[in-house]
Structures are given as C-alpha cells and as structure tokens.
C-alpha cells in the first residue's frame, strides 16, 4: 500500500458514489514527477546546473555540430517564453557555457552556440543524467519498462 492508496481509501469511504480510480493514476504520476524531479536536480546540481540550464545546454548539444541554434529555435524546443529564455541565456553566457554571435543569415538575429566549456560540461552532465535515470528505473525489469514506456507514449499522444 502506498500514499495514494490511503487517499483512495478515504475517498471511497467518504464518496462511495464516485469512481476515484483515475485519482490513483494521476496521483501516482504527480508524486513520481516530484520524486524524479528531485533526483534529477541533485544529479544536475553536482555539475553546477539546474534543470533549466541543462535543458538549454542539452538542446544545443542534441542539435549536432556546430551546436548552434537561434533563440527562437531554443524557445520552440524548450517551450518557455522569450523573457525566460533571455534570462537563462544570460546566466549561461555569464558562466561561459554559451556564446552569442550575429546570425550570418540575418544580421538582426543572434545565434546561440555552446562554448568548448559548455560542450564538455553538458557531455559530463548528460552521462550522469542517463546513469541516474537508469538507477531510478532499477525496480522495473526490461519488460515492465517497455510496457510503461508504451502506455505513457500512447497516453501522451492524446495531449500533444
């Protein structure tokens, strides 16, 4: 029995007329999100990053050489506002993890690129991040992981 089961028992006792089964699923998803986010933040913090800065650096890294994107592309990929992105970029530039340069294709535009320091850091951090994710999934065997992934993918498609 977990925390969510106790909540469901209470609702079943207080409102037996309601089918509260969906609360179990959404409650567990919400609680897992909190626990997983906490574990991810700890791993990233060990590399001097938080999830927001890691998101930007990882997006640039995933883009492939020369690891450059426009701010608009970063905003679209990370789904944050331009003001939020500007703040993130300012912090990363101050730490010498990214650099801004003029876009050669649009003189009014800017290109964001990983610096060598940023590339090295994100490579270290993503390695630790993936190792941490494997650790977080250790209680599930390969078949359970595949089944969970398939079900979550199917469910997510309803929203995206």
Question: PLM ranges: what are they?
Answer:
Residues 54, 66-111:
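Canonical helix-turn-helix DNA-binding module
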Residues 1-47:
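N-terminal leader segment of winged-helix/HTH proteins
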Residues 18, 49-51, 114, 140:
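Alpha-helical hairpin
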